[in-house]
UniProtKB/Swiss-Prot annotation:
The gene is Slc25a42. It catalyses: ADP(out) + CoA(in) = ADP(in) + CoA(out); 3'-dephospho-CoA(in) + ADP(out) = 3'-dephospho-CoA(out) + ADP(in); adenosine 3',5'-bisphosphate(in) + ADP(out) = adenosine 3',5'-bisphosphate(out) + ADP(in); AMP(in) + ADP(out) = AMP(out) + ADP(in). This is Mitochondrial coenzyme A transporter SLC25A42. It comes from the Eukaryota. The keyword Membrane applies. It is found in: Mitochondrion inner membrane. Mitochondrial carrier mediating the transport of coenzyme A (CoA) in mitochondria in exchange for intramitochondrial (deoxy)adenine nucleotides and adenosine 3',5'-diphosphate. The keyword Cytoplasm does not apply. One of its GO terms (cellular component) is mitochondrion. InterPro entries: DNA_mismatch_repair_CS, Mit_carrier, Mitochondrial_sb/sol_carrier, Mt_carrier_dom_sf. SUPFAM superfamilies: Mitochondrial carrier. GO terms for biological process: ADP transport; AMP transport; ATP transport; coenzyme A transmembrane transport. Keywords: Membrane, Mitochondrion, Mitochondrion inner membrane, Repeat, Transmembrane, Transmembrane helix, Transport. Solcar repeats lie at residues 31-117, 129-214, 224-312.
Length: 318
C-alpha cells in the first residue's frame, strides 16, 4: 500500500515537473518570438529610412523608360530637392514604414522560427545549420513576410512614383485603387515578388549566417564586432539583390502600371515589353548600380541592428 502511494507520488511529481518544464519552455519561446519581432521591426525601420531617397530614385527609374546612370540619378535627387523640398526625398517613406516594420518583424521572427524548426528536423538543435537548411530558412522567411504584407508594398511604390497631389496619404491610395482599378490590383506583381524574394532572402540570410559561422571558426571569437556584422550584411545584400534584381524591375512595372501609362499584364508580357523597348541588360538591370550602393547599406544596417538588439534584449532578460 505504502509502495503504491510512493510510486503514485513519484509519478505525480514527475508529471508536475514535465508540465512546469513545458510551461517554462513555452514562455521562453513566446519571449523569443516577441524579442525577434521587436528587433526585426527596429532593424527594418532604421535600414529603410537610411536609404529612402536612393530607394525612391531607383523606383522612378525602374518604372520609366528613361536610361539610368549615376549622374542622372543624382540629378533627379537634386532637382527633387530644389522643386519639392528636402523632405520630399522621403516621400512615400511613411508608406514604406507601414510596410517595412511588419515585413521586417515577420521576416526576422520567421527566420528564427524556421531555423529552430529545421534545426530540430535535421538534428542540429542549438547549432549552426548546414548550408541547405540555412538557405531554405531564409527563403521561407522572406516568402512568409512578403505574402502577408504585399499590398503595402504596392501602395509604397505608387506613392513613390506619383506627384503628392495624386494621393494625399496611404489610406487614400487604398481607396482610389479599390474604386478605380479594383481590389485585385493590390496584388498585381505578387508572383514576381515571391519569385524574387526566394533567392533574395534565401541568399541574404545564407550569406550572412555563413560569414558569421566562418568568422567564429577562424577568429576564435563567439561574436563579431558591429563593423564586422555591417560588412557581412553588406556582402549578403550585394549577393541577394544582384540575384533577384530583374524580377524586382518586373514587379515595379506591374505595381505601377495604372499610373505610368503601361498596360497591366502578366510576368512574361511585362518582361517581353521591357526587353523589346529597352533591351535585356539595360531594361532588366536598370538602377542596379544604385542598388549596389543602397542595398549593402540597408542590409548591413538591418542585420547588424537585429543582432545587437537581440543581444541587448537577452542581457536585459537575464
Amino acid at each position: 500500500m505504502d509502495n503504491g502511494v510512493q510510486e503514485g507520488s513519484v509519478r505525480l511529481g514527475e508529471d508536475a515537473e514535465a508540465v512546469l518544464a513545458g510551461a517554462v519552455s513555452t514562455k521562453a519561446n513566446h519571449r523569443q518570438v516577441l524579442s525577434s519581432l521587436l528587433s526585426g521591426a527596429l532593424a527594418g525601420a532604421l535600414a529603410k529610412t537610411a536609404v529612402a531617397p536612393l530607394d525612391r530614385t531607383k523606383i522612378i527609374f525602374q518604372v520609366s523608360s528613361k536610361r539610368f546612370s549615376a549622374k542622372e540619378a543624382f540629378r533627379l535627387l537634386y532637382f527633387t530637392y530644389l522643386n519639392e523640398g528636402f523632405l520630399s526625398l522621403w516621400r512615400g517613406n511613411s508608406a514604406t514604414m507601414v510596410r517595412v516594420i511588419p515585413y521586417a518583424a515577420i521576416q526576422f521572427s520567421a527566420h528564427e522560427e524556421y531555423k529552430r524548426i529545421l534545426g530540430h528536423y535535421y538534428g542540429f538543435r542549438g547549432e549552426a545549420l548546414p548550408p541547405w537548411p540555412r538557405l531554405l530558412a531564409g527563403a521561407l522567411a522572406g516568402t512568409t513576410a512578403a505574402s502577408l504584407t504585399y499590398p503595402l508594398d504596392l501602395v509604397r511604390a505608387r506613392m513613390a512614383v506619383t506627384p503628392k497631389e495624386m494621393y494625399s496619404n496611404i489610406f487614400h491610395v487604398f481607396i482610389r485603387i479599390s474604386r478605380e482599378e479594383g481590389l485585385k490590383t493590390l496584388y498585381f506583381g505578387f508572383t514576381p515578388t515571391v519569385l524574387g524574394v526566394i533567392p533574395y532572402a534565401g541568399l541574404s540570410f545564407f550569406t550572412y549566417e555563413s560569414l558569421k559561422s566562418l568568422h567564429r571558426e577562424y577568429s576564435g571569437r563567439p561574436q563579431p564586432y558591429p563593423f564586422e556584422r555591417m560588412v557581412f550584411g553588406a556582402c549578403a545584400g550585394l549577393i541577394g539583390q544582384s540575384a533577384s534584381y530583374p524580377l524586382d524591375v518586373v514587379r515595379r512595372r506591374m505595381q505601377t502600371a495604372g499610373v505610368t501609362g503601361h498596360q497591366h499584364g502578366s510576368i512574361l508580357s511585362t518582361l517581353r515589353s521591357i526587353v523589346r523597348e529597352e533591351g535585356a541588360v539595360r531594361g532588366l538591370y536598370k538602377g542596379l548600380s544604385m542598388n549596389w550602393l543602397k542595398g549593402p547599406i540597408a542590409v548591413g544596417i538591418s542585420f547588424t541592428t537585429f543582432d545587437l538588439m537581440q543581444i541587448l534584449l537577452r542581457q536585459l532578460q537575464s
